[in-house]
Every structure is written in C-alpha cells, then in structure tokens.
C-alpha cells in the first residue's frame, strides 16, 4: 500500500480525541485505504461497513434511537468480535446513509469503540448531508454531530508522495526541501533526476490506482487502463445527476482538456451553448467542484487581501483534479513525448494543472488568477496565510524570464507585493522580488499559520 502524509494527521487525531473522523474527497483518492492502514497500525479489530456494497446495512441506523440499538443491529452485519477499546469501525460511502452521520454522536458518546467514516463527493447525496438527515429524522432528534466528528479532505498524491512511492530516496527529498526553505540551488545531478520523476508524475498523476499500477509493473499501458476506469467511474456518477443537467456536466468534463489548451486557458461558456447564461449552469460547475472532479480558479481584478472580495465567479479556469487524467485525455502518444522531454510540446496547460493540484493538496482551498487589460495575466495569486498575497507564474519553456504581467503587478506600489514565485524547469535563483523555483518544488509551497497561538491578555 502507498504511504500518505495524511496518515500522520489521522494518527494524531485518534491519539488526542475521542471523536469520529470523516474523510471526504473525490472517488479513488484513497480514503478507505487510509483507514485500513490506521487499523493495522493501532487496532486489534477492524470492521468495515460499505453502504454501496451492502445497501441493507442502512437498516443499522434507520429509526435507531440510541447506541445500544445501533450496535445490536451492527453486529448482524459482521462476523468479527467487537473488542472494547481495541476496535475501529469504518462506515464507508456514508453519502448513501446520511442517518449514519447524524447518529454517529450516539456511538461516540457510548465510547466502546472508535469510528471512521468516508464520503465520496462524487454524487449529490453528500451535499448538505446533515441537512437532509435532519429533515428525515426530526422526530428522532437528528442534528449535526458538532463536537463528535471532524472532517478532513483527501486529495491525490502530491509530488512528494509520488516521488517516495516510485523510490526516490528520503535524503534526496530532504535535500530538495532544504533548498526550497533556504532558497538555494539544488545539486545539478539531483535536479535533472527530479525533473525526470516530475515528467513521470505528469502522466501517471497522483490517484492511488494508477500510481500503484506503475509501482507494480512500470507499465504505462497499465496506468492508462486504471485512468480510463476512473474517468468512466466519474462519468457514471455524472450520469446519475439531475437528468436535465447531466448532459451539460458530461460536456463540461470533456471540454476541460481543450479549454486548458486554448491560449488564455479560461473556460469559454459559448463552447457549451452560445445561448446559455452563466447563472443557468452555475450549479453544474459548483457540483464538479464539490465532487472533487475539477478545480476552478477564479479571476480577481486586484491582488489584494481578501481575494474573495475581488473575484469574478463568471470568469474562471477549470482544471482536472488529477494531472494524470488530463494527460490521458490528451492521448495521441503524448505520454511518450512527455517522458522524453520534447521541447516542442506545449506543457503550459499540464504544468498549470499540476500546480493547481499541488496548491489544493497543500491546503490553499480556493484558488485565483489575476487578469486585467492594463497589466496582463498572472497564473495564480494565493493568500499566503500571513496577510500577504503571493503571485505565482508557471513557465514551461525557455522563456521563463519573460513575464510582463508579473513585473507589472510587482511594480504597482498600491498592491504592496514583496515576493513572487516563478515555477519553471530551471534551478533555484533569485532576482530581486522574483524567486525562480523548479516546477517540482510546488509541492513544498505551504500556507503559513494564519491564527496565532497562545495570547494572554495583560490588564
């Protein structure tokens, strides 16, 4: 099994709280396996209830009034002994059983066992999960399990996790991180090797099944088979959406690669229907975001804190949730050309997609780009977490030092920008406010701590 960074956070959670933990995220990001690894590390007994594979298991919670009733019914769905203090019980795919979410508080209060939940955002069932359950079970006293359950979101493997999975030595990762932290060049030999690993990441991506297929076989065709299966799974979920909107969703999903390959990479609404207005299919884009299928990056007119006040929701780029799926959708032998590092390929869309994916995985939440007729366009602007805005430009060619728009906003005194990052194929260097980093270092860009720690008021 693939090791994931989230394992440390999960261990810390179960060591320090009695609450249940729900992992959410897109299909096939590894939520269930994260709990299976946890069970092997910390528990003697593990029980897994999957509400998709075993629909009858929903009866465990339907109409239940207390933990005793729930546990009695649960015992009918497992042949394993439940050992108090030593058992982890996973409720998998809880979007199919919203009552589980609202009633988990009874089980946590009872305290005999520990609980995990997973929910796939691919499907409308999970949206407003607590609200739906409350409507159904008002007489049973259903309510949101505040104080009884925490929620963490999983993403595909980031580049650091991928590098470890394919055998990059930990000391090399440490060297690269040290170079990032101290803004110094990576050893040239290491840099060349990491660029090869990065090009492999572009075609394999970070979804566990394709990554595991590569680790086990080193066969890109096997990787592609896994990617096709995941795309088909996504399309199956889309087909179960509102009948009036599923065709539009399907078309949006299929248009992502070509729209990203366009000159400005912005999603052009007329490609869907010249007669449609944004408001009419805004929910379709929101569904794809909440489902984890796509990453929207909204336009801001000024790079100022808070960015959300300057955003234009009807102007956006739409990236794939995983760069490997994007590369697969381009097809036409592009995998081999990427691996060989052909200089005539337009890597722009793929590079920007991988950066969007990395920023999401590192906790930046909503992403933005800057565009104005007067100053030009900058690929990403993010809130660094320390009260500043950080512009990020992504360059895939030899002209990485040409970035007029970035220079324009750095020179605009009213924006008060003291640093910008240019992600490119080259090694680390600094020119005044501009920091040039190898593209693979996007995995180390973290959001700084926003909330202060201990603060004692002196009166």
Predicted regions: what they are:
Residues 34, 38:
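Hydrophobic positions on the alpha1 helix immediately C-terminal to the Walker A/P-loop
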Residues 1-15:
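Pre-Walker A adenine-sensing motif
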Residues 126-262:
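Interdomain motor-coupling "hinge/lid" segment immediately C-terminal to the ATP-binding subdomain
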Residues 426-459:
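Domain-level recognition of nuclease-like catalytic cores that cleave nucleotide substrates
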Residues 31:
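Conserved lysine of the Walker
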Residues 114-120, 153:
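Structural recognition of the conserved hydrophobic beta-strand(s) that form the central parallel beta-sheet
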Residues 53-85:
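Short glycine-rich substrate-engagement loop in P-loop NTPases that contacts/grips substrate
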Residues 211-386:
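Accessory nucleic acid-recognition modules appended to NTPase machines
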């Amino acid at each position: 099994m693939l090791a994931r960074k989230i394992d440390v956070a999960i261990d810390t959670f179960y060591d320090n709280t009695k609450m249940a933990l729900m992992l959410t995220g897109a299909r096939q990001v590894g939520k269930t396996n994260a709990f299976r690894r946890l069970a092997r590390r910390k528990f003697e007994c593990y029980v897994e209830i999957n509400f998709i594979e075993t629909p009858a298991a929903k009866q465990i919670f339907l109409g239940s009034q207390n933990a005793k009733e729930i546990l009695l019914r649960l015992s009918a769905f497992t042949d394993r002994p439940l050992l108090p203090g030593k058992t982890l019980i996973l409720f998998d795919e809880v979007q199919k059983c919203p009552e589980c979410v609202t009633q988990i508080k009874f089980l946590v209060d009872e305290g005999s066992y520990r609980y995990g939940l997973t929910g796939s955002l691919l499907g409308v069932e999970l949206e407003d999960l607590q609200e739906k359950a409350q409507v159904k079970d008002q007489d049973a006293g259903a309510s949101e399990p505040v104080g009884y359950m925490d929620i963490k979101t999983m993403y595909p493997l980031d580049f650091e996790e991928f590098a470890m999975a394919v055998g990059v030595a930990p000391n090399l990762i440490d060297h690269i991180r040290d170079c990032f932290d101290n803004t110094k060049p990576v050893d040239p030999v290491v840099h060349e090797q990491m660029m090869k690993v990065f090009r492999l990441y572009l075609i394999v991506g970070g979804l566990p099944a394709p990554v595991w297929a590569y680790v086990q076989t080193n066969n890109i065709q096997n990787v592609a088979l896994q990617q096709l299966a995941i795309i088909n799974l996504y399309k199956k979920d889309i087909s179960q959406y509102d009948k009036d909107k599923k065709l539009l969703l399907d078309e949006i999903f299929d248009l992502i690669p070509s729209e990203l390959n366009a000159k400005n990479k912005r999603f052009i609404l007329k490609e869907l229907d010249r007669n449609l207005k944004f408001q009419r299919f805004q929910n379709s884009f929101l569904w794809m975001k909440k489902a984890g299928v796509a990453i929207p990056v909204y336009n801001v007119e000024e790079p100022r804190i808070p960015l959300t006040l300057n955003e234009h929701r009807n102007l956006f780029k739409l990236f794939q949730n995983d760069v490997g799926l994007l590369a697969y959708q381009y097809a036409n032998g592009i995998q081999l050309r990427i691996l060989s590092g052909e200089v005539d390929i337009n890597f722009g869309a793929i590079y920007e997609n991988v950066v969007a994916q990395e920023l999401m995985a590192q906790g930046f939440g909503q992403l933005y780009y800057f565009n104005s007729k007067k100053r030009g366009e900058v690929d990403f602007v993010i809130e660094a977490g320390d009260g500043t805005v950080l512009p990020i430009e992504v360059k895939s060619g030899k002209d990485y030092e040409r970035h007029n728009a970035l220079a324009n906003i750095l020179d605009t005194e009213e924006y008060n920008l003291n640093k910008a990052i240019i992600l490119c194929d080259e090694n680390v260097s600094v020119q005044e406010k501009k920091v040039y980093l190898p593209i693979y270092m996007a995995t180390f860009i973290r959001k700084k701590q926003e909330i202060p720690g201990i603060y004692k008021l002196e009166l």
